[in-house]
Regions:
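Conserved short beta-strand edge segments in small beta-sheet-based binding/regulatory domains
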Residues: 151-167
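Hydrophobic alpha-helical transmembrane segments
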Residues: 123-139
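Short S/T/G/P-rich N-terminal loop/turn motif that feeds into the first structured element of a domain
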Residues: 2-125, 168-197
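Short amphipathic alpha-helices within nucleic acid-binding modules
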Residues: 80, 134-151
């Protein structure tokens, strides 16, 4: 019985620690944070509309995770652009993972637009990427760290055009929280069986 309690106690503690890191505690963007993030954003070459979107997104923080939907079109020659983008990605994703974010889906375009209804004609995408962020505050800190950095220059040099917008999940059948919970439970169950038998 004592062994059983220790095994499952450790499993519960491990998952709680993971949850605290991966989900966080709902820390929201403060007014001071907002001013710091926007001071950085306003130094870029983004349009006034994009800058306003950033401000609105940060100002209405709900403290929850979100996903950034990205569409990318590489410059020619694509091999050279792909290498530059990979350099940027390796650095950026490393910083993202430290803040409990990660790539959720990355894919290559298999055709030109199949549907384009009542919107500007934007076509010829090379790839798409869905990136998970723990919070808007994490995005802000990453922006401060990334804008005007050398690795951000790799991204700008690689892309002919890009399109991105944040989204919150209303249906997510591939939750990392559930996966990690199942893995920890499986390890605990196997450990219990091995030690008891």
């Amino acid at each position: 019985m004592a062994t059983l309690m220790i095994i499952w106690g450790v499993a519960i503690v491990a998952y709680c620690l993971f949850w605290a890191w991966y989900v966080g505690f709902g820390s929201k963007v403060s007014e001071q944070d907002l001013n710091r993030y926007m001071a950085c954003v306003e130094q870029t070459e983004l349009s006034e509309e994009s800058v306003a979107s950033f401000r609105n997104f940060f100002a209405n923080d709900d403290g929850k995770e979100f996903f950034m939907v990205n569409l990318l079109r590489l410059k020619e020659p694509k091999n050279e652009s792909r290498q530059l983008l990979n350099k940027y990605t390796s650095i950026f994703v490393g910083k993202l993972i430290k803040r409990a974010g990660h790539p959720y889906f990355v894919g290559l375009a298999q055709a030109r637009n199949i549907e384009n209804l009542n919107c500007e004609v934007v076509d010829g995408w090379t790839r798409t990427a869905l990136m998970r962020y723990r919070s808007r505050k994490d995005l802000g800190e990453l922006l401060v760290d990334t804008f005007r950095s050398e690795h951000h220059g790799f991204k700008l040099a690689a892309l002919e055009k890009t399109f991105a917008f944040p989204a919150s999940a209303i249906l997510n059948i591939g939750s990392v929280r559930s996966l990690v919970g199942l893995v920890i439970a499986l390890i605990a169950a196997v450990t219990h069986i091995v030690l008891v038998n």
